[in-house]
């Protein structure tokens, strides 16, 4: 069982959900920071069958922010170079916690499911910035294939090891990668390089990896991006 606290938004219709979106917030944020977006998505008729699970990261010191404790999925040592030192232990620990949450959906033991089971192939793992990095790792390494990954303003960590960490079923992973080209925090180039790595180094199918660019968008989200995310969800976890 995962130790993470979650905010859960179930279908308004009261019907049993047939799909789940996990969405992980960024550094220093919480589930509350993305609850409005989740509520908006849940109100779309095409996504009325989806339940939204927003986990909260543990509070821990962050080297990049002078060691200040804050909600963080892993320690960030630097963001100026994708080949720099990484908190591998922290990355893998948070990834394992998300996998536990996925397993609880599979088993029907998660909050509010009451025995109703949601298989991995009906689950999307998404996140913003630091949360998106964990989402990519989770999608590539989960023991059972998930429906997709939604990675917003983020990058793929552990690139030197991911080829050995990934599961064979991740070869068919569907990825929604999105980034603003004016991002001063996580460089737009990092999103581009992540997509190139997924396609060229991990051999994901071109048609399974989407890359969306939002002109003049900084390290944030925008309405157009959320509409594109909704379209991705409608495609990979459609109503049954």
Swiss-Prot record:
User: Catalysed reaction per UniProt?
Assistant: S-hexadecanoyl-L-cysteinyl-[protein] + H2O = L-cysteinyl-[protein] + hexadecanoate + H(+)
Name the Gene3D superfamilies for this protein.
alpha/beta hydrolase
InterPro entries xrefs: AB_hydrolase_fold (IPR029058), LYPA1-2/EST-like (IPR050565), PLipase/COase/thioEstase (IPR003140)
| Active-site positions on this chain | 129, 183, 219
GO molecular function (one): palmitoyl-(protein) hydrolase activity
Record keyword Nucleus present: yes
Highest taxon in the source lineage: Eukaryota
User: What Pfam family does this protein match (any one)?
Assistant: Abhydrolase_2
Which keywords are on file for this protein?
Answer: Cytoplasm, Fatty acid metabolism, Hydrolase, Lipid metabolism, Nucleus, Serine esterase
Q: Tell me which GO cellular component terms the UniProt record holds.
A: cytoplasm; nucleus
E.C. no: 3.1.2.-, 3.1.2.22
Subcellular locations according to the entry: Cytoplasm; Nucleus
What is the predominant subcellular site recorded for this chain? cytoplasm
One example of a Gene Ontology biological process annotation? fatty acid metabolic process
Which enzyme class?
Answer: hydrolase
Q: Which family does it belong to?
A: Belongs to the AB hydrolase superfamily. AB hydrolase 2 family.
| Function in brief | Hydrolyzes fatty acids from S-acylated cysteine residues in proteins with a strong preference for palmitoylated G-alpha proteins over other acyl substrates. Mediates the deacylation of G-alpha proteins such as GPA1 in vivo, but has weak or no activity toward palmitoylated Ras proteins. Has weak lysophospholipase activity in vitro; however such activity may not exist in vivo.
Q: What is the designated name of this protein?
A: Acyl-protein thioesterase 1
Origin species, per record, is: Mycosarcoma maydis (Corn smut fungus)
Starting at the broadest rank, the lineage of the source organism is: Eukaryota, Fungi, Dikarya, Basidiomycota, Ustilaginomycotina
